[in-house]
Amino acid sequence: ANGQLVRGMHFTAGEYSFVNTNADEWENTEKNMACQCSTSNLLKWYRARKALPEDAPLDGRSFFAAANAGEPEALEVLRRFCHAVAVQIYNLTVLLDVEKVAIGGGISKQPLLLESLRSAYDGLYASRAGQAYMEGLPRCQIVPCAFSSEANQVGVAAAYFEAMQKKC
């Protein structure tokens, strides 16, 4: 907030991973942001769509190779995945009025991911155009995290150095 990281009382502010994504299935521990909007789930959906065994070797690189090549099944799964993530970004934006949401992790390096995610996010607003309550709702920018797949490690290091500075 106001240009500073918000850490929260227990230093978990901004940890959106464990937000429940389906109130009707509260007991289902897989219905949270970390499970539904993860690379693991993206690959799970792709395996299912392609009728591959659950243990079929697959990673983000091979998935995006298929998607970038225009494979219909990969693009269908990517649209579904990006819609799920976009809904959560919408919720976060409405709740906190954030300026930007930074997407991290290894797949965040894929231009197709960000393009598809932005398209899904814009589609949410377009699907409710004309609804009175939508008029004043904020919109955020979706950007790649500066440290992509190393974001967690950089965050830990930054927190450590900040804490050490306060001690000196």
What role is predicted for each listed range?
Residues A1-N2:
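A cytosolic small-molecule/anion-sensing beta-strand core signal
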Residues L5, T21-C168:
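ATP-binding/phosphotransfer module of carbohydrate and carboxylate kinases, centering on a glycine-rich
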Residues G8-E15:
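A short acidic/small-residue loop/turn micro-motif
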